[in-house]
Each structure stands twice: as structure tokens, then as C-alpha cells.
Amino acid sequence: VSPKKNKNMISNEVIESFLQGNDPEEFIVAIEFDYASNSIYKVKEIPGKGKEIRKDNFIPFAWIGDLRGLKFYNDSKMAQKEAMSKFGIVIEKLETHGNERLDKGLTFMVKSLKGYRELIQFFRDGGCDPWGEKTKDKILILPPVEQYLISKEKRLFKGFDDYDQVTRLVFDLETDALEPKDGRIFMIGIKTNKGYHRVIECLDETQEKGAIIEFFNVINEIKPSIIGGYNSANFDWHWIFERCRILGIEAKKICKSLHPEHSFTRKDNLLKLANEVENYIQTSIWGYNVIDIIHAVRRAQAINSSIKSAGLKYITTFINAEAPDRVYIDHTNIGKMYREKEEYWLNVTNGKYKKATEYIDLDKKFPGVYIKTTGDNLVERYLDDDLEETLKVDQEFNQASFLLASMIPTTYERVSTMGTATLWKMLMLAWSYKHNLAIPEKQGKTDFVGGLSRLLKVGYSKNVLKLDFSSLYPSIQLVHDVFPDCDVTGAMKGMLKYFRDTRIKYKQLAEEYYETDKKKSESYSNKQLPIKIFINSMFGALSAPQVFAWGDMYMGEQITCTGRQYLRQMIKFFMSKGYTPLVMDTDGVNFSSPEGVDNHRYVGRGLNWKVKKGKEYLGPEADVAEYNDIFMRGEMALDTDGVWPSCINLARKNYAVMDAKGKIKLTGNSIKSKKLPLYIEEFLDKGIKLLLNGDGKSFIEYYYEYLTLVYQKKISLSKVAQRAKVKLTLEDYRKRLTTKTKAGNSMSRMAHMELAIQNNLNVNLGDVIMYVNNGTKASHGDVQKKGEGIVLNCYMLESNILEKDPNLTGDYNVPRAITTFNKRIEPLLVVFKQEVRDGLIVDNPDNRGIFTTSQCELINGLPFEDGDQDKLEEDVLDITEAELEYWKKRGLDPYYMYELAEENWEGKLGLFQPV
């Protein structure tokens, strides 16, 4: 039987009012708390008027559980009463609705009518540190700003529809070294989204001192709501405050905030990146939101494998925001070009430049294309382009953070770095406060059955139908009511339904206005971004009980086990229609389409929200519509991305696909890696495209052509070279060599550091050293031990040599380059017959294989090893022992979701029906 719960669904209107904050006050961009006066300050940016600061107050509060056993005030009721009187404490019993986890959780609310400091002191005087180890699950006190927003039901950015309406200032420094102790700032660029632009130059330390002071004066004059840089947390702010110290500037005096008695703080903080956490130093200036824009890109990169780098140059190109005349300067040349002020020819159409001494009269030969300028001017143009791109990247990637901050009762700085489970935690804490509810006892984290990820056909497949369920896990929760019992009012279900309905509405509006009003369409598209984050993070929060008090591993496992059953149901249905399943991953399956699929017809009956009654569906869409009508109820629905020309499945979670527009997507370390040598990346880009086009013969010819280039040392050094970043000073590196590993061995040598020592380089942290292996055997590593000493099988490349001639060729280790190359090609051979697999790869092009057209045909279903490909029955369709064990514990039939299907559905699965 299907589980039944009797909570009434909370209306979307109630949820919307709660999320947006019931208090109507608009234009709050920041909240500050003054500990000395126990006062809240609201910083507002009023359109047309500028900044305004208003004082307010609130009653601070704490959720507490059973403090017995903690010797609170030595268990003396008299002492507790005296302390309550002293600190203005009132205690309220919270509602639990008889729920066991709520009864065992934080069941009291403690408030201080005297202030936040007094609330904290009440606990400390009683011997309980609110943030101590023994009280961490007994006392919950939020920061004052979050308490204020929750208790007053206010939200940031109310009244602003778009991120661009808020005044944003970005800045960037140009320095002549990587560390403040080794150099100075010679240029500061400042730009806002409201048209302000300024470059402050400084030729010496005296001018540098003035430039830093002027930088803070500009901030004070403009009073932006948001201050951002790109990698500013690790670089720019560190430089500014270190140079202040070195130059003898009192940073607290020149950094003017919006409060005369407060300046800035710098504290260790954490950036949450999907399943990882990264440390950084948060700079905070009173009254402002200070962010590092790279954090938003890094967070996007953690969940989007298509983003290969978080570098500004790359990410601007990725979002198609690069200006055609963008000027680029290698970071190692910026200081030199600025200092020497040599003359250059600048191509104003594409941003490229050449030394004036090497070319004559380019402005006359190409009027309107070239102008003569100087190195320092190029640096200024480069800086301005950097700032413009920083604003564009901020607009693109922080739009979601801005909209999240308008719903989550916390600071913008925190929203920009917090994990998704914490988003739900903040919402549920606010809901519990509003409805006088206890906070549930936390559950422990346990192992449970995850999603179904299988590979059924390795190799090459054509006419690939890509199907995935629309928001599978959230839809399962809504349709089958899979929510924790401790959410006694049904808030999580109400919010999830609101988010889902609202996102669909925004997506439909974005599509509706796409042709007639691009700006309005983009606005609706942006509005659905944060909602997508909420929807997709619900399952993660539910499965993270150590963070999210309402987490429930039992419910999380029901979601994944039900998801597996829906995946099996979908596979059975489409196999009955002649499709062949290729690969599946949690919420979707790729199928190879049958012959004659274009003749499939189905008239929709409107039994699912994705199917229009009376509409005739053709081809694969007919089968998707029929499946939706028969099996999908409520929010559940199957989506199609259409039929894609081809795909190559190399291994589990390693594949290449070509979409209907010819765009190729690569997934997995077999064919995509940040550490891939450029010459191999270049080959794979073209080679994989040939294979996806089904042209095995051309791929084989291209392999031998490219192998010949590698063999004859005709590959440019820029593509063969390794790029290593300096992460240790030379002094620290030398110290490292004197230490031993845990096994008692000497520490390994680093080729780039050995080259720096050998060439007497004065390297800085962050410098990139390019070098080429020139050994004579494949086994020759970059550095080899020989007796007590070492042998360097590599040489260094000067970056300016490659700038002058990017196609420069030279000496490199051919056997090693070929071995590395062939290792990357081998996984691709899964698309070929055995004859090609056995005879294609050689280490000398003279020994190439010859293959017939028939032998070059691409295939699928033939793995290298037996375990490389899953079996349909045993590995996919059969329910695992772990799943059966869960369903037995739960008291549910594993096929309970079929209860919602249309009557007589059994015949629609043919031989694959489950009962």
C-alpha cells in the first residue's frame, strides 16, 4: 500500500508571503548589528535618493532543549530565577504536536528583553557556552542579523526586481609582484554598473599610498551596496591591507564605512562547493556587502562539469560575454609593460598588439584598424576590460544569490557562500519561529541505497533518445508524500510545491516572451534560477541530518528506491516499443531509437500535465506522451531532450554526445581533464567529432597523421609543454627536500622548482613555469634520481618566446609523448571491432595498420572486459537485496507507485510487467 499522511497542503499564497517576508519594508540592502548599543541598523538604497540608515531593535532569542545534566547554574532553580531577572529572560514552551523527534528536540524558546549580549551572558554565567561542544545540540542561537530578519519578517532587496538595479562596484589591482612584500600596486581600477569608471595610477610608493587612500575615498563617495572583485578574497584585499601595513597606513582610519565608529573586519570563513569546503578570509566593511565574484563561479563549476575553469578569461568566453576588442596581457608581463612604456601597434578591432619596432606604418597600411600606443596604455585597457568582464560575470552568476537573499533571512555575504542544506535550514528555522514550533532532534547519518547508474551498451550508438524525469526526486516527494514526520505543519511540502509551481510558471513565461520581449523573457528565466536551487537541494538537505535538523535518512532512502523503480518502469515501457537502453544515471535514460520510430503516433488524453488532450504526437514524442498519460500522475512527468544524432559510451559516467545542433558534450576523466596536455586535447576535439559523425575510417587516418606529427617533432612546444604553478617559495622548497615521507623516503623533486634553481630564477608564488621533457625513453620522467644526485630530463621555456612564435617547434621526448598520447586514445577504441582494437595503436607511424572500410565501421555492445558493461536483467531490472530490505522495513510494496497508473497498465509493459 502507498503511505498516507493527513497534513493539509499549505496554500501557495501563504508560502509566498512567508518567503518574501510579511513585512512590507523595501530597499533594505544590508543589516548591521551594533553589540555596544544592542541596536540593529538597516542600510537602505532608495532609488533616486541614495543611501539611508535607520535604527531598529528586536528581541533576541534562542532555541534550547533539555539542559539537565549540564549543571546549568549548578541545577539551582533559585540561581536560575535570579539570573532570569538580571538578564530580562522570558521562557516559552514550544509546540511539538506529539511528535517524538520534536519532543526530544529544542522545545523551549529563551528570549532576553534586555538584549543580545544579555542573552549570551545568561547562558555563560550558568556554565553553558552556547557554542561549546557539550551544548551544540542543546542550544541554538543565530547571529543577531538573522534573528532580526526572522523575528521582524523582513527580507533584503525587497523592491528590487533585478540584480542590476542595485549599485554594484567592482575593483581590480595591478601589481608588479605576486606577494606584497616583493612589490607594489601600480594601478587600481574601479567600475560600477551605474556608469562610474576610474583608473588610479601610481608610479612610486608615495603615489601608491595616495592611490590606496583614494580607493577607499571612492567607495565612501559612491556608497555602493555591493563591493566585489575577482579572486579578491585571496589576492586584492590581502594586497591592500598588507601594503597599508608596509607603507605605514592606518587601514582602519582610511577605510570609511557607513558608521563612524566601525571600519572593516577580516575573518576566516568557509566557501561551500557541492561536497567540498574551502577556506578563505572574508573582508567585511560595515554597511556594505563585500563579495568575491569567483565564489559564485566556483559554486557553479562544482555542479556543472561543462565549466572547465573559473578563470575570468575562460568564464567570460563561456557565457559569450567577451568583447571582440578585448585586450589580454599575460600576468607575467603586466608590470614590465607598464614600467617600460614601449610603443605598440594595437589592432582596435580584435585587441591584439605588436611591438612598434617590428612593424612600420601599420596605421597607414590598415587605416582604422591599427593605432600606435604604449605599454602602460595597453595595461590600462586590459584593466578596464577586466572590470567590465567582472561586472558581466557578477551579473550572470550572482543573479541567483541576489534572488536567494530576497527569500532567505540572512546576509548577502552568507548566501553567496553557504551550502544548499543550510538554505533549507534557514527557511525551516524561520517557519518554526513564526509558528512557535520546536526544533526536532537531529538524526545520525547512515548508509542507504542511492540512485541507479548503469551502462548497458559501450561503444557508438546513433539516433539517441534522451529521456529524463522532470525534477524526479522533488516530484516523488510531492506525489508520494515523502516528507519527514517531524515537519508537523507540512511546511517542506508546501514550500516544495510552491517552488515547483512557480518555476514552471516562470519557465513558461520566459518561453512566451522569448520572441517578443527578450528582456522580459530573460528576467523570468533569471527568476527561476534560485527556485531551481531550492528544488534540487531538498533531497540533499533531507539526506544531511547533521546540518538540517529535519533531515530524515529513512525518507531519503524511500526517494532513491522509488526513483530506481520509476527508472525501471520507464525502461520496460520503452523496450516494449522497440527502444534499446544504452545508459542510465539516477533520473534519466538514453535509448537507441528503433527503425520506423518516425511513424509512431499517439493522440494525447491529457491525463498528465505535460500532455495536451486531443493533440497528435509523432515519433518518440508520441511514446513519451503515452507513457506520461498511463503512468505519470501529479507532479511526475517524463521529459525528452529529443533525438540526438549519436553518442559514445566509454565507461560508466564517461561519454561523449552530439546534440541536435551538432554541439558536443564530453563527460568523464577518460576524455576530459584539466591536466590534459594541449596536443592530446587538440586531437580529441577533432577525433571525437569524427567518431560521433560515424566516420571511423577518417578517425583512423587522422590518428596516424597526428602520430606522425608527434613522432617527427612537428607538434609545437606550446602544446607539448607542461605548465606548473609555483606553490612554494624556493626557500620552503629547499626545506622540504630535507624532510622525509612517512615511509622514511626523501621527498619527491619538483621539476619546475629544480629548473627555477638551475636557472637562478627569482620566482614568486603563483608564477607559472613552462617546461618540456626532453628525455630519450618513455620511462624518463621529468626528474630522475641518480645516486645521491638528480638528472633533469627537461628544459624550461620562456613565455615570451612562445608569445613571439606560438607555433615554435623543438626538442621533446618523443617516446614519452607517444605513450601518453596512446593511453588517451585506447579508451576510444571501444567503438571499433576487435581487428582495429588489436592493430591500430603503434609507437612508430611506419608500423601503421591497414584496415578495410568494413573493419572501420563503428559498433556497440562489445566491452574490453566483462565487467565494463552491465547486464539488463541482473544489474538493472532486478530489485537488489538492499532495496528489498528497505521496502520490507518500510512495510511497502516495492511496486506501490503502480497504484497511480491507469487501469490495465500491465499490458503496456508486455513481457516486462513486474507482477
Whereabouts are the PLM-identified features?
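Common nucleic-acid-contacting/processivity interface regions adjacent to the catalytic cores
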Residues: 5-14, 18, 333-480, 518-573, ...
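DnaQ-like (DEDDh/DEDDy) 3′-5′ exonuclease domain used for proofreading
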Residues: 4-223, 249, 372, 385-408, ...
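Active-site-proximal helix-loop-helix substrate-binding element of RNase H-like nuclease domains
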Residues: 200-202, 206, 223, 227, ...
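Short active-site loop/helix that positions an aromatic residue
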Residues: 235-246, 470-484
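C-terminal, non-catalytic extensions of nucleic-acid polymerases
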Residues: 597-915
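Cytochrome P450 catalytic domain signature, combining two hallmark sequence patches
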Residues: 248-255, 481-490, 604
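Short amphipathic alpha-helix segments
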Residues: 73-84, 560-577
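Short glycine-rich phosphate-binding loop at a beta-alpha junction
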Residues: 225-232, 579-585, 590-592
